Each structure stands twice: as C-alpha cells, then as structure tokens.
C-alpha cells in the first residue's frame, strides 16, 4: 500500500495583491508565478520531492522525505525573496486525493485564501522516518503516442494544444474519480499522476477511456519507490520501455 | 478590424533532449521550462507583448510592436543562457487563430520539431510600423465568479482545480471554433483570450456556453489597443468594473 | 566628446531590511541580490545598456538610449517581483564619474539610503533623442594576459583571486582619479571601464601603472558607439585583436 | 580546531565559450553568471553550506555537511539547466586556505580550466559523518562602521565603492597571509571570512591593520558551528551585538 505525503502550497492573499492598488502588469505576475514554481521545484526537488504548478497560486507537491524543518526552511526562503508569502499544509494518506483533502481542510480551517491575517501557515504532520517504506509513492508518467508526428508537425499549434488539453482534462477527472489519483500536466505531451498503488488494469482502463472519449492515445510508465523523485525516475525509464517495445503500460522492475 | 501579430516559440528538438542520454530529472526540466517562460515574459513583455506558456515546449506570444531585430535578440539571448535553443515564427492576421496557423506552417515547412538540424529558425514578417493602428489587438481577460469562496475555500484543492480546468478546456475550444480566438489559462482562475475584435454578444454567448456545459461561471473584461500589454491592462481594468458593478462583460472605454 | 548617461540603482532601505526582524539567511540575500542584478542586466541590457553589480545594493548602469519611461517600467517591474524596491537616479556628463556624481547627489538630496520613507525615487533627465550621437559612449574591456595559464591552472584559487582583485583595485582607483572613468570587475579576469573618450596613451599609462604597482599585466580593447552594448561589443572584438596580434591596446575601427 | 570542507566550483572551459564563435553579449554572460551563482546559493545553502561568487567562473563554497552524492546532484542539476557545465573539487583541512589548496590541486591535476575534454570533474573526499563536530566551521562576518552615513549618503557612489573595495582588498590579503583565512565580499559593506578558529586578538589585529593601511573601519561578529549556515547566522547575531554595544569584535555565545 502506498503512503503519499502531499503538501498544498498556497500563495497568501494572492488575488487581492495582484490588483492592489491597481492591477499589476500581467507579464510581471507571470514571471513571479513561474519563477516561484521553478524555485519550489528546486527546493522540493532537491530533497527528492515533486511539485506541480497546478493553478500557480495553489501548487501541489509530493513531499515524502521532507520533514517539518524542511518545510519551514522553504517557507522562510520564499518569504525572504518574494513580495508574497506562502502557506504550506501537509497531508498523508494511502490515497493521494485523500491526503490532499486533509491538507486542504487544514488550510481552510486556518482561514480564507484571501484573508490578510492568515499568512505563512504551516500545518500537518509529515510521515515519521521509521514509518517510511520503499513503496510509499507510486508515480505514473503518461505521454501521447507520436504527439510530434500527429500534432506538432501537422496542426495549427493551438489545435495541437487543444488535443493535448482535452486529453489531460479527461484523464485528470477520470483518474481522480476512479482511482483517487492526482494527475498533472507537466508540459509538452506529458502528464504525471500520483497514484494509490493501482494496477495495470486500472491504467489500461484509463487509457482506453481517454481514447474513447476524446480520441487521444496515451501510454504510461509506472514507478514505485520511497520518494517522488525515485518513483518518477523509474516511471520515466518504464515509459522509455513502452516506446521501445510499443506497449501501453510498463511497470518499472 | 484587429491585426494580431502572433509568434510561435518552439524549443528545438526538445523531446529527444529530455531523454538523452538518459531521462533527465523532472524537477530540472520543470525548472528549465518555467524559467524560460519567465524570461520570455520579460523579454517580450517589456516590449509590450504577451507570451503564454501553452505547452511550455511550444509557447504562443502576441508580439505587435516587436520587429525582426527584437525577435533575433530574444533568440540570441535564450541561446546564450540555456542548454536548448528556440525557433521563432511570426504570423499576422485579423484572426489570431489564422495568424498562429501561418506561424505554425512556416515552422513546419522548415522541418520537424524533432529534427536535429532544424535549430534557431526565424521566419515571418512583422507588421510594418506604418500599418500599425490603435485597434490592432483585442485582449479579453476572464475570471471565475467568486472562485475563492466557491472553490478554493471549500473544496479539495484538486476538485477546485478540476472545475477551473474544465471551464478552461471548454472555453478554449469554443472560442477557437466560434470566434477564431486563442484562450490561455494564466493561473489562479484567470484566462486570457486573444480575440478577433468580437462583440459583447459573442462574449456573452461564450460565457453562457461554458456555464451550461460545465457549470463554471465566468465574467470578462475586454480591451483594445496597439499592443497586447496596453489592451491587456485595459481588459484588467474592465474586469475590475465587472466586479464592482456585478456585470458579465465590460469593454474598456 | 563622449556623453555618458549613467543610472544609479539603489535598493531602498536595504541594510535595515536584511536584519529585520532578525538577520535573514545569507544564502537568501545572496540569491536575491544576484537575481536582481541578473534581471537588471536583462531589463537594461535588452535596451542596449550595461549594468554593473558594484556593491549589489548600489549598482551602476550606463543607460544611453533608455528614456524616463523605460526607467519607470524597470522600477515598476522590480517592485512587482521582489520584496524590496529600487530608486533610480540618472546623470549625464561627458565624464562618467561626473555623471555618476550628479546621479548620486540627486538621490542623496531625496533622502538617506536607509530612510524608510524614501522609496522608488526616480530622478534626473535622460539625454534628448535629438542630442544623441554615435560617439556618446566609450567602453574599454580589459583582461589579464594569460590568466588561466599563469594563475587559474597554477595557484591556489584564492591566490589567483587575490591577484585579479589587486589588479582590479589598482585599476579602478587609477582610472577614476586620472581619467574620470568608472571601472567594474565583471567576472573571470575581465574588467569593463566606462571612459571619457580617452586615448591610447592614457590606456597604456594605466596598464603600465597596474603592472608596476601590483604586477598584473592587462590588455584592453576599446569601442565607441551610441550605446553601451554597441560600444562594448566593439571593445570585445578589439580585445580579440589584442589576443591575435599580441598587442596591449586596440581601438575598434 | 576547525575542520573546514571547501569546494571549488569551476565553470568548464568558460573563457573560450564566451567568445565562441564570436564574443557573446556581455549582459547575457552577466545574467548567466549571476543566476548560476544564485542557483548554487540555493543548492548549497539549503544544505547548510555557503558559496561565494569570487570570480564567478571560479566560486568557492564551504560545504560541511554535503556528501559526495549532494555534490553530484548539484553538478547534474547545473548540467541540465545551463549551456555550461561545472567541475567540483572538495578539500578538507583545519586551515581554509589549505583546504582550498587541496581542492585546487585536484582540479589542476585533472586538466586545465580551458581544456575542452576536462568537464564535470568531481574530486575529493568529504568529511565522514562520524568525524564531524560542532566546532568545524568558523565564520566571521565583517561590516564597515556607519558605511551609509559616511559613504553612501555622502560620496559619489563610485568613491563609496572604492573605499569599500580598498578595505576588502586589504582585508582579504591580510587574512589570507596572517591567518590562512578566506575572505569574500558579499555586497553592501559586508565581508564574510572563513577562518581557522582564530581568536579575538587576531581579529582586532586585522581590523587595525585595515584601518591603518586604507582608513576603513571594520567590526566583526564571529560564529562557530557544525555548518557554514549555523556558524554564519551566529556571526550575524554577534555582529548585531557589536552594533548595539559599540564593540569591534564579538563572538557568538
């Protein structure tokens, strides 16, 4: 059974800040958001976690291996370098969706995302080191079959994007409802899902569902390990195996 | 009539690079992609353009006011600072979708996105300064009504995200097919669309369509100007008017 | 005669901020400072200016070609993305040192660098476009003869650094007092000086002085143009000529 | 007795790269260098180390607590995100200067800094965890007495800078030769020295020497701990004590 530690990262009171005293230049907001995400990728990633940009003002991270001190350091480092601060809330569950549910509840209990007085919240309990196992995190790395040949090199770029986006929108919803999994678009034709130790049949079912519903053909490599980084790298290698052997689902060995 | 100048930014041969010689660490790829986008936001944004992250390996920019030299400088600056290079292709049309179609065609003609020998392409003709007008770019800035109150402060963050994402997926498709417009999620509950000078009825129709189809309620501020930055800032102010006056569509005066 | 436009960039009330409420983590301060400098390099550099890190909390830029609006945009963009703000003060003079003197005076008149109420000052008048000429900026690019062979590949790195640093400390002082020029270490074994249209004899004299005083052998390429970027690139090519022809001073033709 | 672990970071074959095929735009080189330094500050800093920009193409880090894997990860992460690679060489000694000497020797033995074939070297042995103690690193944080009042708010900014720079050049040389210590300018009026467990008399002597030689008045806070970060933060607090109690040297208790 997996045991996923999820951290919800929320920029404090961000919406109001973006229009105070006047709406701020969009390109500066875009720069701020994407650089904050890049920094979190390094801060969390170099401790073997993964973070996903999600809505940028709310980001979701898989943080198995990061203790409370590591979270506090990340929060402090952001506060020292950005005009905004972040709140962090940690949830743990075999189901990634339930873990994020716990993390969200804790943050909502502390106050609204647009409450000026609710800043730099740090809630939740990381997994104890003694309870960690080598099968705590399952990561599935999907991509689209021959996306470059079928889309990028053929269609208007926006239509390529629509195809990828419809595939993603369908997969994210299906995986959430059928498998308690959290799926994130990570650029190109790639989607990374954090899963509750689901099996080959479940992956095949999701791939079929997306193909039947929106006509986008996916394949997936799956890895299982102690941290998001280790599981994710195993998933990438498994995806390479899919490519070489022309298969739809591969589990890392 | 609008006259949108669109630039397609494509990372050269990116897919193969990400797995050569072995799959690279995902967090480094995420950092690279989001910082490249941040840099383009500044490079293009400080010349009054807008750039959208789209798929990150393919980004779409509105570049009215940027001539060929400005494009060449951006291309050179990226080449000097990243392990990857970018190709740029410029299209101009009253229809943003058609402009991007031209830009895409030009780049596809130059070779595949995964052709090792096709690097740092720069194609297409910017608008001549003498032909530019104060109504060349129409920008529509949408957001979700009370997203914080209805979603962020209530739901599991992933379910908030699913709602925003379904709203976006529906809007992008509808605006593309009905209005030749290009719509981009820009974080939070915000979507920015580059439009072909469409009117209030067309915006109301799109908002109704999204509400009926996926139950997400949008409002929109619309600006028209010489550059994306000026039109976009006007749109933001118009969106503030929607908020204050509780209306669905506002055009900047 | 040159006509250098210099901008002093000063982080507002930075010293007190770094220790409020407690001393902030040094690595975050270093990250903040060097990224702010990197951003200014792009914001100013992509408008054909040069900026030097100097003391990081006070930076000096050569901004021929940047008008007041460009300065205001840079100031706004920093304010939107950093936890600190910057003041900018512009001076113009045939002497770079005198231009910086004017810029400094204007900022000192506005209040102390550690005055909480003195933020985002923007003072001084850029050169009128009609008064700009192709010989407004002289840039001299120095490097150390065979620094890799004599220092980097031979000495303890700190002793290499001491040599470079003593060479720089001597050159900066001499060029300031003898030639009203501003010299900046820019990394490696490179020093860039902004000069008042001085001639070959003055450069040879400075090189001799440094060699005699601290035993560091320099050579220099010199460029003259409308902007720092153009003059600086010409200087780099001239320095390549020094390397190829084994000469001490070369002026770009 | 201190036991400093020093890592020399050297950009591989950087000089030739900056002029190949033609000299690259200086502002892009400045951006690249300062961002690489910022990234290393985070990568090393968030593992409790310190890194100093030194010459930018050669940087010096204090890395007590970073093992070989952490070094390898940093090297890989840079290689994934920059157009250049870095070599890393680790030395350990009670004398910081000797530790850097070892690190430099190892890298020089591997080949020239401008040898195309010598890339991504990783040499040297970090301290074994069992051998680490709470007094391994001594950090001294100097600043200039009333630098804002005497220099920044009074003089031409370049003359302020000359004063700070002369103070630094004198201190770095003296501390290296008298105390085997490595001193680095870190911006503003701040100098951080990595020291070989020297005592109050040695600090007072250095301060007097700088004052007598170049007329710059320094004070210093000193911290001793297991890591650079912990020792450095203690030093900052001790420096605050100097400010409050108007003393020249304070050791953290």
UniProtKB/Swiss-Prot annotation, chains A, B, C, D:
It catalyses: GTP + 3 H2O = 2-amino-5-formylamino-6-(5-phospho-D-ribosylamino)pyrimidin-4(3H)-one + 2 phosphate + 2 H(+). Keywords: GTP-binding, Hydrolase, Nucleotide-binding. This is GTP cyclohydrolase III. The lineage of its organism: Archaea, Methanobacteriati, Methanobacteriota, Stenosarchaea group, Halobacteria. One of its GO terms (biological process) is biosynthetic process. Catalyzes the formation of 2-amino-5-formylamino-6-ribofuranosylamino-4(3H)-pyrimidinone ribonucleotide monophosphate and inorganic phosphate from GTP. Also has an independent pyrophosphate phosphohydrolase activity. The keyword Hydrolase applies. It comes from Natronomonas pharaonis (strain ATCC 35678 / DSM 2160 / CIP 103997 / JCM 8858 / NBRC 14720 / NCIMB 2260 / Gabara) (Halobacterium pharaonis). InterPro entries: GTP_CycHdrlase_3, Nucleotide_cyclase, Rev_trsase/Diguanyl_cyclase. One of its GO terms (molecular function) is GTP cyclohydrolase IIa activity. The gene is gch3. HAMAP family: GTP_cyclohydro_3. Pfam families: GCH_III. PANTHER family: GTP CYCLOHYDROLASE III. Its EC number is 3.5.4.29.
